Each structure stands twice: as C-alpha cells, then as structure tokens.
Amino acid sequence: MKNTSKFQSVVIVTIVGWLVLFVFLPNLMIIGTSFLTRDDANFVKMVFTLENYTRLLDPLYFEVLVHSLNMALIATLACLVLGYPFAWFLVKLPEKVRPLLLFLLIVPFWTNSLIRIYGLKIFLSTKGYLNEFMLWLGVIDTPIRIMFTPSAVIIGLVYILLPFMVMPLYSSIEKLDKPLLEAARDLGASKLQTFTRIIIPLTMPGIIAGCLLVMLPAMGLFYVSDLMGGAKNLLIGNVIKVQFLNIRDWPFGAATSITLTIVMGLMLLIYWRASRLLNKKVELE
C-alpha cells in the first residue's frame, strides 16, 4: 500500500509540475507581456500599458477578427453538413465494417496536417489534378481559379477538421434509442418529423461538441490561410504569427493571443451552458 501511495504521489507531482512548467507559466508570461510595451530595438520594455488591447479595436485588426469568426463559422457549418450524413452512414453499416472505416477516418491524423495542406494545394491549383480532370471531361474550357480565395481557405479548414466533427456525431448517433425511433414511426411520424423532433434533439450534444472542436481551432490555423488563401485572406492566427515572428511586436502578439483565448473561452462557456440545459431537458422528459 505504501509503495502504491508513493507511486501515486510521484505521478501526481510529475503531472502538476509538467502543467505548471509548460502550461501555467508560459500562459502567465504571455498575459504579463500583453500589458507591456516594446522599445525601438523591438525588445520588451517593462512599462505597463493597455494600448496593445485598444489596438485590437483598430478597424484593420477588428476586421481580421470578424473575418476569422465568419470563416470558422462557415467551415463549422460545412463540416456539420458533410459530417452528419457520413456519421449516420457509419452507424448504419454492419458492425464488422465500422472499425475499418473509423480506422480510415483516423489515418490522416498520422500525417502532418501541413503536408496534407500542401497536397491539397497541388490538387486544387490551376494546373492541378482537379482542373486537368475537368478539362479532360470537357466540363470547363479554361482552368478554374480556386487557390488564394476564401473558398480555398474553407476547403482547407474542412479538409483538416472534418474528422473532429464526425467522431462526436458518430458517438451520439450510435447511442440513439432504436425502440424510440420505431415507436415514432408506429405512431405515424414521418421521416422528417422523426429526424427534426427526435434524432436532432437527442444528438444535439454531439452536434455541439463537434461544432466546438471544429470552430475553436479553425480561427488559429494560420498555415491554412497562408498556403490556401494568400495575403488577402488572413485569419487572426496569421496576425499572431506575424507579430511574433516577423514584426517582433511581442506585447501586441501576446494581447492578440489572449483575446483569441478569451473568445474560445466564451465558446466553451456557451457549450457548457448548452450542455447543462440539454441534460436538464432530457431529465424532465
């Protein structure tokens, strides 16, 4: 028992130490830096200021933040529209086949997402496979310009984040009470009524979780907008990258990071509140 207790203590201390060293302290440094200034040599100056946060209200940066939210929202809706039927299809397959398709869904995670975006860029380029195939079919006369447009950024985000939508949806759909669906059909409910009044409410936790897992990282995937969208389709993640690596304005980059973290925190709070309300509603029913 003593050895077990010592082992548990060592594990707990190790985990806490790791979190403090690599999570708490770095975030504390970022928060502190966001309230400082920089000098002419681009070094952080120990002078307190709120200017870094007020700069975010500048139309240029505020527009990028709103654009990031819009792009993340569109990508989330696209993932939901594509992911829900796919998750439903997975659940309806025989149990022997499901593990194989789930494995194929997870396989892309074994490859770096940056490499996958490079592959997608080649596929969608003016001289890429998609345009060449459509020209061969005679569907188009001249190559379609897809790259370096907002649509290309959306395609890239959906390509990277779709599995994050499918997995929670699959879990929720798999847990559906089949006798309840059969009872609805026996009582005369149409397929549309069954879907809107029973299936959607019961799978809402999976929908909310999937939307959250897609929307939160979508605003920060700067390399997707860099490679697919170009300079005219920046996300807030690109602003943070430029401030830290190019301009070396660390205080403003830190303030932008904290603002993005707060936005994500508000989304998590909304998810938590929505989950509680849904659970209460289910308990009452």
Across the structure, where does each feature detected by a protein language model lie?
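Membrane-interfacial helix termini and adjacent extracytoplasmic/periplasmic loops
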Residues: 41, 50, 117-158, 192, ...
